UniProtKB/Swiss-Prot annotation:
Record PROSITE patterns: AA_TRANSFER_CLASS_5
Lineage: Bacteria, Pseudomonadati, Pseudomonadota, Gammaproteobacteria, Enterobacterales
Subcellular location: Cytoplasm
Protein name according to UniProt: Cysteine desulfurase IscS
Pathway noted in the entry: Cofactor biosynthesis; iron-sulfur cluster biosynthesis
PANTHER family for the chain: CYSTEINE DESULFURASE, CYSTEINE DESULFURYLASE FAMILY MEMBER
Organism: Escherichia coli (strain K12)
One example GO MF annotation: selenocysteine lyase activity
Catalytic activity: (sulfur carrier)-H + L-cysteine = (sulfur carrier)-SH + L-alanine
Family label: Belongs to the class-V pyridoxal-phosphate-dependent aminotransferase family. NifS/IscS subfamily.
Positions bearing N6-(pyridoxal phosphate)lysine: K206
Amino acid sequence: MKLPIYLDYSATTPVDPRVAEKMMQFMTMDGTFGNPASRSHRFGWQAEEAVDIARNQIADLVGADPREIVFTSGATESDNLAIKGAANFYQKKGKHIITSKTEHKAVLDTCRQLEREGFEVTYLAPQRNGIIDLKELEAAMRDDTILVSIMHVNNEIGVVQDIAAIGEMCRARGIIYHVDATQSVGKLPIDLSQLKVDLMSFSGHKIYGPKGIGALYVRRKPRVRIEAQMHGGGHERGMRSGTLPVHQIVGMGEAYRIAKEEMATEMERLRGLRNRLWNGIKDIEEVYLNGDLEHGAPNILNVSFNYVEGESLIMALKDLAVSSGSACTSASLEPSYVLRALGLNDELAHSSIRFSLGRFTTEEEIDYTIELVRKSIGRLRDLSPLWEMYKQGVDLNSIEWAHH
């Protein structure tokens, strides 16, 4: 077993060796290095064929038509293209958008930008377990609502939203539905031939593909229109200009092919490991599970350890690569906005750790993690005056702290 142990698969994943090997064939003079838009010679044709194969592999995993897959630089761009693109195209119908407070920043900040441009956005608060109440969503829908954006799996707490039911509600009212599926694709089954989803964002690097590549699914029947955000040579049916990075696209395609093959068995394996981890730490005093095991992705476990400062816990767990909140927010000292939206107080939000497991996680690593967490929590609480006061029965909320 190698230390440190990587348990931050929701931030990024290593590229699968099979993917890396495939990508190497599309870069050098000996490989297929041509521009797929070069229609006048074999170098271009071969590159175009490689892109077509990858497009099919991605479409296969999610039950889409390959013509519905638009390549982007990643899920952040896909979210931007979907939300801005749909809002701008359909603004004559209305300027109201609905999303949730626990979406990824790429969705929230895109909506904030649209608010500055005159759109109105409703931010739904989830229930305590992170799941959106569909009655609240329905109540928020208006005649001028043109777009709903609610993610599939949350990147911090792993809860799974009922995208099938949300899709039905949107379709019945003629509202475009966008789903950020970054954390679910290749991990949970997605069948866009059945789901009433109009736009869906995908990433390469969360599922053992390369960074810097993603895709946006844009439904053809019934046809969904978006306005391009990147202009140029008219690539990707005019929706996203820019020379296609063949090596990255091939890598993403191969990663999605592997995911389709291994998904069923791998998810059972990860669910077993996640449950093993939770069962190993859940009897520690004052430990809280954030999210919902039953309605949760099999690879994410978010836990708060009361009376332990999250930062000091991460330092104590230096043999584990884990995060507090998401990679995007863990660089700041703000408590996670996702956990705050669930109703956690600052203290509990600050003392949260996200464990996210993946393809190369072993049982041995999980057992080591359990032992290390138990030891570290014990040691940190021995040093904590707050823990001592709690054990003495002092109500910490009633204390007036002096401000210096």
